[in-house]
A protein has these predicted regions:
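Conserved oxyanion/phosphate-binding beta-strand-loop segments in alpha/beta enzyme cores
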Residues: 2-42, 95, 117-131, 245-269, ...
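Residue patterns forming the tRNA-binding/recognition surfaces of aminoacyl-tRNA synthetases
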Residues: 3, 8, 17, 21-25, ...
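N-terminal catalytic cores of NTP/NDP-binding nucleotidyl/phosphoryl-transfer enzymes
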Residues: 31-94, 147, 156, 222-225, ...
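Short, solvent-exposed turn/loop segments enriched in Gly/Ser/Thr/Pro and often Arg
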Residues: 34-36, 44-45, 80-91, 144-152, ...
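Secondary-structure transition/capping motifs at alpha-helix termini
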Residues: 68-76, 97-110, 130, 134-139, ...
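Feature 926 captures the class I aminoacyl-tRNA synthetase adenylation module centered on the KMSKS loop
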Residues: 202, 400-460, 464, 508-551, ...
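Conserved phosphate/anionic-ligand binding catalytic regions in large, soluble enzymes, centered on
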Residues: 221-238, 360, 420, 457-466, ...
Length: 891
């Protein structure tokens, strides 16, 4: 027995109550159950510093749709939640808080700083989780993990030690991306390239004569965008096959200002076609130069401190900021006559994606992951289709990264994060990598060690997320059952940071892929197509949208029209449309439930006798098939649009209207009313099931009132295609019927006929099947077409010659003109319109005949008046034609 719904849908009063019910009933929880097929998604763990933004809302809505869909299909669906410790982001937040208290991080000390960090995590870390719950996310919150919890810490240590033993992790002096503000190295994936206006400084170095003196007539000229790095130059390079410089092989040049003699080296790295074909080589501050330096055994001279000021190797420039030094060096070169010219140049500059500071390539002792072997199975998995990327075009970006891989710098000069499990003997400096502090040095026997102060890149622990959350390194039942996971849903912007690293980590640690499919989504932009950012002030808070319109409206807005990998624009108007759709579903459901309340509804004895019922059942059945296919192909936006169109157009605007006559005349034909109400209820149930993954709250609230005997819509079975609900003939009849009703409505609208004025509708059709169907729908047609009769016949017998006709497929519809309009009233209306137009034409002619107006008014204003006059004259011609026609009929 269904219950009556409230008059209006109020999401604020419903969503929290329903979500708590789902939690209390443990509907989100998954346990190992070998009688069911598992379906697993791991959440991209949001940062504990984070607050829900539109990107999170889209990402998690997509995941929730998939997990709810699979849960309803009978899968043992696990959505594994958790949060990320976010090393740099969190440390920056804590440092800011300490500054507000007048406390310096280093004065506080590492131990106290970490205490504050854990306090911060406790206070703010759960904020984004509670916000995800507001969205309706059906994660298994009993399994919530944190990338620095005990289990994850154990997994990270295990991986580091194992990979070090296998030679994949090493420590060495290599070029790293150094952030002088955050005072840490960052990975290539964390470098964001920004187009900046700069310069090419063309500089010349004197050649050295055979007697050891610098030439005053021979120079080598090159161009650089970073003249300050010349302080660390240890060579200049030319291409070995460049005939212009063959005579310089083995020669040297003088490095000005520093007065260091450096060699000319021949290296194929040099592009002969670019500039002069000469390149300065600074191994300490350029990754390509570093490689050249290794090939030619060049010294590495670092000229920068960690804060990007010049160090002691910079001589008299020591202590200067890098940009101050640049200016001073250029001025001195100019005074020396060694600055050839300065050229404007726009180029891409590497910046830290967190703080937007220009990074400095620097040689540092860091920990690295050797990538050349690790990346091979990750590349092959996508190449052979073992892992599918959606959309497929993402493969190009994926292979571009795998094919140009560099070793991954994983050490960070931070305190918050997984500390590197490497220990240095206090006596001999021996490095021991181990799961815990060694007791005795294997080299000298010392018993005192100091742990490496650095922490690991955040993405090192995140790369293990698909299996560490299931208990790895222990071989748990969860791990055996739920791994590999099925789908990863993520933004295309972290394909390098996270996706690729999870893939190679899965193959290396588990010997298997971490997931079968990666579903990429784009960015949510503002209505102008701009990226949402604090600086533009165009960010939209999802929680405000939820508070005002409800979570379902936000979810519908984010998914409607969304295609994998594509950016989308966010419009408030679309949220309002989504809210209106929720209200439409609510009101339609309320109408149905009010009418079936207290009635014993039974399955129709002969559904075939009701073409309208057969039509909506068949359309619903086709919808089930189509939506299921779309969902299985991850076409969530297409699937939702089909559900939306069916509910709004076919079910609400057509079928409910079709059914009303039988419902309102139940006393005259109880069986017909029963069949209509049974169809309404059963189709609504299926429609709500199809809608549920997208709009879980409104669908659950309606369903729980429609079917109070069932536990929950979210635990009900997903509909399947049913041959007994397939009625192609009824669909054909209904489509013709709809065309007839639309045609009559259009005629009435064009002639301004109010619904209160009824008219006969004649349908001339020779197809007997269609005629029988139209006859069965006769009373509904009378209601829907504002008719006083609906007559089906095979010819035009009895139809007036002046009847208005509408041609539809396989039939012609006629409406007698005299029944549509009252001739006397229409004559009066037309005469009034004729009088009004006469005045408007006179006024317009008066203005256009006025020389002052024509000569002094703006040209656009004059043209506007001419256009008006032309329109009035056309309208007058039509009015006169109608008047003449009516006079002829009345005579």
């Amino acid at each position: 027995m269904s219950k009556e719904l409230a008059k209006t849908y109020d999401p604020s009063g419903i969503e929290d109550r329903l979500y708590q019910k789902w939690l209390d009933k443990k509907y989100f929880h998954a346990e190992v159950d070998h009688s069911k097929t598992p379906f697993t998604i791991v959440i991209p763990p949001p940062n504990i510093t984070g607050q829900l933004h539109m990107g999170h809302a889209l990402d998690n809505t997509m995941q929730d749709i998939l997990i709810r869909y699979k849960r309803m299909q009978g899968y043992n669906a696990l959505w594994q939640p958790g949060t990320d410790h976010a090393s740099i982001a969190t440390e920056v937040k804590i440092i800011q808080k300490l500054k507000e208290e007048g406390i310096d991080k280093h004065d506080l000390g590492r131990e106290k700083f970490l205490e504050r960090a854990w306090e911060w995590k406790k206070e703010y870390g759960g904020r984004i989780i509670s916000q995800l719950k507001k969205l309706g996310s059906s994660c298994d919150w009993d399994r919530e993990r944190f990338t620095m919890d005990e289990g994850c810490n154990k997994a990270v240590t295990e991986v580091f030690v194992k990979m070090h033993e296998k030679g994949y992790i090493y420590k060495g002096a290599r070029i790293v991306n150094w952030c002088p503000v955050c005072n840490t190295s960052i990975s290539d994936a964390e470098v964001e390239y920004q187009e900046q206006a700069g310069h090419f400084w063309h500089i010349k170095y004197p050649l050295m004569n055979e007697d050891g003196t610098p030439s005053t007539t021979e120079f080598l000229t090159f161009a650089t965008t970073r003249p300050e790095t010349m302080l660390g130059d240890t060579a200049v390079a030319i291409h070995p096959d460049d005939e212009r410089y063959t005579h310089l092989h083995g020669r040297k040049v003088l490095l000005p200002i520093v007065n260091r003699v450096i060699p000319i080296v021949e290296d194929a790295y040099v592009d002969r076609e670019f500039g002069t074909g000469v390149v300065k080589i600074t191994p300490a501050h350029d990754p390509n130069d570093f490689e050249v330096g290794k090939r030619h055994d060049l010294p590495v001279i670092n000229i920068l401190n960690d804060d990007a000021t010049i160090n002691k190797n910079g001589g008299k420039f020591e202590g200067m900021d890098r940009y101050e030094a640049r200016k001073a060096i250029v001025e001195e070169l100019d005074q020396m006559g060694l600055l050839v010219k300065i050229e404007d140049h726009v180029h891409n500059v590497g910046t830290h994606d967190r703080c937007k500071t220009t990074i400095e390539p620097m040689v540092k002792d860091q920990w690295f992951v050797k990538m050349d072997e690790l990346i091979k199975p990750a590349r092959e998995a996508v190449k052979n289709g073992e892992i599918k990327l959606i959309p497929e075009r993402m493969e190009k970006n994926y292979f571009n990264w795998t094919d140009n891989i560099r070793d991954w710098c994983i050490s960070r000069q931070l305190w918050w994060g997984h500390r590197i499990p490497a220990y240095y003997c206090d006596d001999c400096g021996e490095v021991v990598v181990a799961k815990e502090m060694p007791k005795v040095c294997p080299k000298c026997g010392c018993t005192h060690f100091t742990q490496d102060p650095d922490t690991l890149d955040t993405w090192f622990s995140s790369a293990l997320w698909p299996f560490e959350t299931l208990g790895w390194p222990e071989q748990t039942e969860d791990l055996k059952y739920f791994y590999p996971t099925d789908v990863l849903v993520t933004g295309y912007d972290i394909i390098f940071f996270w996706v690729i690293r999870m893939i190679f980590s899965g193959y290396e640690q588990m010997g298997e892929k971490p997931f079968k499919t990666v579903l990429f989504h784009g960015l949510v932009r503002d209505s102008q197509g701009r990226k949402m950012s604090k600086s533009l002030g165009n960010g939209i808070d999802p929680l405000e949208i939820i508070s005002q319109y409800g979570a379902d409206a936000l979810r519908l807005t984010l998914i409607t029209g969304n295609a994998p990998g594509n950016d989308m624009r966010f419009y408030y108007e679309r949220v309002e449309n989504s809210r209106n759709f929720a209200n439409k579903v609510w009101n339609a459901s309320r109408f149905i439930m009010m009418n079936i309340e207290g009635r014993e509804i039974t399955e129709p004895k002969d559904v075939n006798a009701r073409p309208g019922d057969c039509w909506i059942m068949s359309r619903c059945n086709n919808l089930v098939k189509d939506v299921t296919e779309n969902m299985d192909k991850f076409e969530l936006g297409i699937a939702l649009q089909k559900v939306y169109d069916f509910i709004w157009d076919e079910f609400c605007d057509w079928y409910i209207e079709l059914a009303k006559y039988r419902i309102y005349h139940a006393e005259e034909d109880a069986e017909a009313a029963n069949d209509a109400m049974w169809t309404l209820r059963e189709v609504l149930k299926k429609a709500l099931k199809l809608l549920h993954p997208f709009m879980p709250f409104v669908s659950e609230e309606i369903y729980s009132n429609l079917c109070p005997e069932e536990a929950s819509l979210m635990m009900s079975e997903w509909p399947v295609y049913d041959e007994s609900w397939s009625f192609p003939e009824a669909e054909n009849i209904a489509e013709h019927f709809k065309a007839i009703v639309k045609g009559v409505r259009n005629v009435r609208a064009e002639m301004n006929v109010p619904n209160s004025r009824k008219a006969k509708v004649y349908v001339v059709c020779e197809d007997q099947t269609l005629c029988a169907g139209f006859e069965a729908l006769k009373q509904s047609a009378i209601m829907m077409a504002a008719a006083n009769d609906f007559l089906i016949q095979q010819d035009k017998t009895g139809i007036a010659d002046d009847a208005v006709s509408v041609v539809v497929p396989d039939a012609t519809v006629y409406v007698p003109l005299e029944e549509l309009i009252d001739f006397e009233q229409e004559m009066e209306r037309l005469r009034k319109e004729e009088s009004r137009l006469t005045k408007e034409i006179a006024r317009s002619n008066g203005m256009l005949n006025n020389e002052k107006f024509v000569s002094k008014a703006p040209a656009a204003k004059v043209q506007e008046e001419k256009d008006k006059l032309e329109k009035y004259q056309q309208m007058m011609d039509q009015v006169k034609e109608r008047l003449e026609g009516l006079k002829a009929k009345m005579s």
